[in-house]
Amino acid sequence: PDIKGCSRTDAGVHALGFKLNFHADTRIPAAKFPLALNQHLPPDIRVLDAQVVPEDFHARYAAHTKTYLYRIHNSPIDSPFDEKYYTRVPRRLDTAKMNTAARRFVGKHDFLALCAAGSSAAAHGDTVRTITACGVERKGDEVEITVTADGYLYNMVRILAGTLCEVGAGRMQPEAIPGILASRDRHKAGPTLPAKGLFLKSVEYD
């Protein structure tokens, strides 16, 4: 079938709530689709729910906002059971400063400074996005960065997370964020963190 996914995630990125749609000419009720499909899927992919949607629905273009989660293991020692699902930062991060910086990203801005080279959107000058929520939370040795926006540029969340880590490590001040965005210069922002710590958390529809 013609499968329409909600997002084009980079290799190595995980998903907690990926949405897709396809046309199914079947009498099987939607409620039974998860059990039926899961019998044929690899163990690291699971269908959690299925719903009937209008014929013209598109999982990507109908999305109102998408929320991403970036996981950081803030410890000098790795957690062997979770190593594939976070990026380790050994130096203690100041999450209060990171939260102050995170709030500076909220709003409608030109995010070219948080866009990796090779972006088709950047090539067409389409770099304005609206972040509706951005926050940082510590849970023991884990630091979670959560971002909700109406759209994202290439590697935008990974660069945003890298920039917040620079703030948390004391190498950058929260007050620098507006200037970084205004500069439209990728070199002013922080590093691109590895894909393995990034999760598509949820997709919201009207």
Task: Tell me the role of every PLM-derived stretch.
Residues 1-206:
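Structured-RNA-binding interfaces characteristic of tRNA pseudouridine synthases
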